[in-house]
Design a protein with these regions (language model features):
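Phosphate- and divalent-cation-binding pockets in alpha/beta enzyme and binding domains
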Residues: 16-20, 46, 71, 135-136
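Cofactor-binding loop segments of dinucleotide-utilizing enzymes, especially the Rossmann-like FAD-
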Residues: 9-11, 39, 97
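ALDH superfamily catalytic-core signature
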Residues: 24, 28-29, 59, 65-212
């Protein structure tokens, strides 16, 4: 309801965003209405336990992984909180035989490479009709290869870095795993030389249904 005080526990990877919003709200809201509690990765669970166990907190909203969502669901049971959970998925983009491939590729690029593929609404996989898969892959790879890696404020940059080096390593390992199961890298697939947690825009086809990629 409007006017209820809020406690925000931002992601340990991006705490400054929530703190910036709190600074903008400073002086506009009464003291104690908007409260930001950053926490390191090591302290995220203890902070979560306090929020879940408190009888003063009546509702909890969370966006993140399914594993953490299940933990919060169970932890909030003792205080019977209202819960709003937006959890991980594996949503496909489906390309039918009758699809306009130029439109399909444009949609695929907008979905998959938005914020470096790090948003919760990105398509996680592409299911393409066998009659058009070759043309679709060719067009998609051409668009992906044209993306320029670099600083987000530099002119011409099409895609920036991943959140950290661990994410880059994870991408490398997932691509290697897919190759070992018979997949083919059409473009990208590597960390480029130089500093930063960059990873080449990558298109992989014929990925096994049980692949971690």
């Amino acid at each position: 309801a409007a006017g209820c005080p809020v406690v925000v526990k931002p992601s340990e990877y991006t705490p400054l965003t929530a703190l910036a919003l709190a600074r903008l709200a400073d002086g506009l809201l009464p003291p104690g209405v908007l409260n930001v509690v950053p926490a390191s990765r090591q302290n995220a669970q203890p902070v979560g336990e306090v929020l879940c166990d408190s009888s003063h907190i009546k509702a909890l909203s969370f966006t993140g992984s399914t594993a953490v969502g299940k933990w919060l669901y169970a932890r909030c049971a003792s205080t019977v909180k209202k819960l709003g959970l937006e959890l991980g998925g594996n949503a496909p983009m489906v390309v039918l035989k009758s699809a306009d491939l130029d439109i399909a590729v444009k949609a695929a690029m907008a979905s998959k490479f938005r914020y470096g593929g790090q948003t919760c609404v990105c398509a996680d996989r592409f299911l393409v009709h066998e009659a058009v898969v070759d043309n679709f892959v060719e067009k998609l790879a051409a668009e992906a290869s044209a993306l320029k890696l670099g600083h987000g404020l530099d002119a011409g940059t099409g895609i920036g870095p991943l959140i950290d080096e661990a994410a880059t390593f994870k991408c490398q390992e997932r691509v290697k795993g897919a190759i070992s199961q018979g997949a083919t890298v059409v473009c990208g697939g590597n960390k480029p030389p130089g500093p930063g947690s960059f990873f080449e825009p990558t298109v992989v086809r014929d990925v096994a249904i049980d692949s971690e990629l």
